[in-house]
């Protein structure tokens, strides 16, 4: 569309006016071309032709309207370009803000994850510390129990050893007294031997025969002492029986009782007189069997002859031949055999004397001592005929029976201790080892201590109440058998310890008093959770703000309405400019603008 120039007229004034209008119109068209070129459009050209076939002619009003329309279009395109630029800038800002929010959200999420990991690690450490503390507490309690048991056992052992020490001290004192007594007896015996020997032989003993004679003297002196002791014992018994008889006489209320008691006393006195007469006869026989002075002189002469013969034999040993030596040996064999037999008899006699002294010791048991008395009375008649040691056999047999019965006593005490003290671990007695009285005393002492403790602890509940408590525990904690009671008690104890530790830690964290109840703890934890939730909401509101939230909602709604048109417009621009990226739109438009200039 090109406007046609008007035809020239004849008058000059109208021509001038037309020229000015033409120039003005051309200037307006030039300004419009400039605008079109600025916006990348092709300019319009004014032509001066007479041929009007290919031309469309507008009048002044239509050309003016055309110019106005073009101006409006150009202005609208510029406004749209500005609007697009603003939209691009706002889009970039929104992207930047979105990236910032995403980075903030990622940082917050990372921080929350880190805090969760830290909290989990702290929880695990707290659990480990609680387990360690529980295990240490259990270990310490077990140690304390073991130490208490050891202390009790040591106290028992200490008491036992104290008793043993006192017994040993008593035995040592008695042994010392016995040693002193034996020393004194030995000294007295040696003195009497030497005195009798000096009285008989008028010299000091220095040969083997003298020693044998001393042994013989000792033997007879011991028999004499024994007879004296028996006689004194019988006299004491007779005195005690007479006293008892007098007491019985005093106690008899009637005359018949007095007569009966007198008859009994007469019978007993007759029997005692007979016994004393028999003892007197025995003593007389014993005195008759003793050697006389004449026999002692003969013994001395024989000893002197034997000494001389021995001296001669020693001097003539090298000179006499083998046959004479054999003859002398044959002659000396009976005397040597007699000497050896005498020594053996002497040793046997000493052993029997020591056994007899042990049996007659006052420290011997009472029953055994009484039985030895009876044995002495029974063997009274044969004491002189034999050596007087026949009563030792039944006593030793009875002692052997008592020692064998110790095993039965040990078994019965063991069963009794299993009933009274089942936790006492008794050592298994070896069959080869003998049973000691100390072991039996230890068992009896432990049972007595247990009985005393039971008497002291009289407030202990009955067995039925304890059984009811155990059954109630089984019902409460679902324990089918008694074997599962201790594991379930340990489990309950550990759970209770964990709960107490957790409550204590919460009280320390919340700065509560240790005497505060669980209701107070639960209420404070609930308040803390509510405060934390309110703080989180306030922090979210502080970050985003209530007005920003509403504006973001409005912006999102506007963007939902605006983005489809903007997307279509940008796609058209990308196709026209032949580019693929939104960031390349602005540089391409700038290039076109430069090219248009």
Swiss-Prot record:
BP-aspect Gene Ontology terms: cilium assembly; regulation of microtubule cytoskeleton organization
Primary location: cytoplasm
Gene Ontology MF terms in the entry: gamma-tubulin binding; identical protein binding
Taxonomic superkingdom: Eukaryota
Localization annotation: Cytoplasm, Cytoskeleton, Microtubule organizing center, Centrosome
Disulfide bonds listed in the record: none
Residues in coiled coil: 75-179, 254-326
Xref: PANTHER family: CENTROSOMAL PROTEIN OF 70 KDA
Protein name: Centrosomal protein of 70 kDa
Origin species: Homo sapiens
């Amino acid at each position: 569309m090109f406007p046609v120039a008007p035809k020239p007229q004849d008058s000059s004034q109208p021509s001038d006016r037309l020229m000015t209008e033409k120039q003005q119109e051309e200037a307006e068209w030039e300004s419009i071309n400039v605008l079109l070129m600025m916006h990348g459009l092709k300019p319009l050209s004014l032509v001066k032709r007479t041929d009007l076939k290919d031309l469309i002619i507008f009048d002044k009003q239509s050309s003016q309207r055309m110019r106005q329309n073009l101006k409006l279009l150009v202005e609208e395109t510029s406004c749209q370009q500005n609007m697009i630029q603003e939209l691009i800038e706002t889009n970039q800002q929104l992207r930047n803000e979105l990236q910032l929010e995403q980075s903030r959200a990622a940082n917050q999420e990372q921080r929350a994850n880190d805090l969760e990991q830290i909290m989990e690690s702290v929880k695990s450490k707290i659990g480990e510390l609680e387990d360690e503390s529980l295990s240490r507490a259990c270990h310490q309690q077990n140690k304390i129990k073991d130490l208490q048991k050891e202390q009790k056992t040591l106290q028992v052992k200490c008491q036992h050893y104290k008793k043993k020490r006192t017994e040993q001290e008593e035995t040592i004192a008695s042994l010392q007294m016995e040693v002193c007594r034996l020393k004194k007896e030995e000294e007295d015996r040696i003195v009497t031997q030497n005195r009798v020997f000096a009285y008989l032989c008028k010299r000091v003993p220095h040969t083997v025969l003298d020693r044998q004679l001393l042994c013989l003297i000792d033997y007879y002196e011991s028999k004499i002492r024994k007879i004296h002791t028996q006689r004194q014992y019988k006299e004491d018994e007779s005195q005690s029986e007479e006293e008892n008889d007098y007491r019985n006489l005093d106690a008899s209320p009637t005359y018949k009782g007095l007569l009966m008691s007198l008859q009994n006393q007469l019978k007993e006195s007759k029997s005692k007189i007979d016994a004393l007469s028999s003892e007197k006869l025995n003593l007389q026989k014993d005195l008759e069997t003793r050697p006389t002075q004449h026999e002692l002189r003969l013994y001395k002469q024989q000893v002197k002859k034997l000494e001389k013969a021995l001296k001669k034999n020693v001097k003539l040993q090298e000179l006499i031949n083998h046959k004479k030596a054999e003859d002398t040996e044959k002659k000396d064999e009976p005397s040597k055999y007699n000497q050896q037999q005498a020594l053996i008899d002497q040793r046997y006699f000493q052993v029997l004397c020591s056994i007899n002294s042990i049996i007659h010791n006052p420290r011997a048991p009472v029953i055994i001592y009484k039985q030895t008395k009876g044995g002495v009375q029974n063997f009274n008649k044969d004491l002189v005929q034999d050596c007087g040691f026949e009563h030792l056999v039944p006593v030793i047999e009875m002692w052997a029976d008592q020692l064998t019965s110790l095993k039965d006593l040990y078994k019965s005490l063991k069963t009794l201790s299993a009933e009274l003290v089942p936790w006492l671990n008794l050592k298994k007695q070896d069959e080869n080892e003998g049973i000691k009285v100390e072991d039996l005393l230890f068992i009896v002492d432990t049972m007595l201590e247990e009985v005393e403790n039971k008497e002291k602890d009289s407030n202990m509940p009955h067995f039925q109440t304890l059984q009811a408590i155990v059954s109630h525990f089984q019902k409460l904690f679902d324990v089918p058998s008694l074997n599962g009671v201790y594991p379930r008690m340990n489990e309950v104890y550990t759970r209770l310890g964990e709960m107490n530790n957790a409550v204590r830690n919460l009280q320390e964290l919340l700065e509560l008093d240790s005497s505060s109840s669980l209701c107070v703890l639960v209420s404070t934890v609930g308040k803390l959770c509510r405060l934390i939730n309110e703080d989180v909401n306030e922090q979210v509101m502080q970050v985003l703000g209530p007005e920003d939230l509403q504006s973001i909602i409005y912006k999102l709604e506007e963007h939902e309405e605006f983005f489809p048109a903007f997307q279509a417009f940008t796609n058209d621009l990308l196709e026209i400019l032949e580019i693929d990226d939104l960031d390349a739109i602005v540089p391409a438009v700038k290039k076109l603008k430069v090219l248009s200039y």
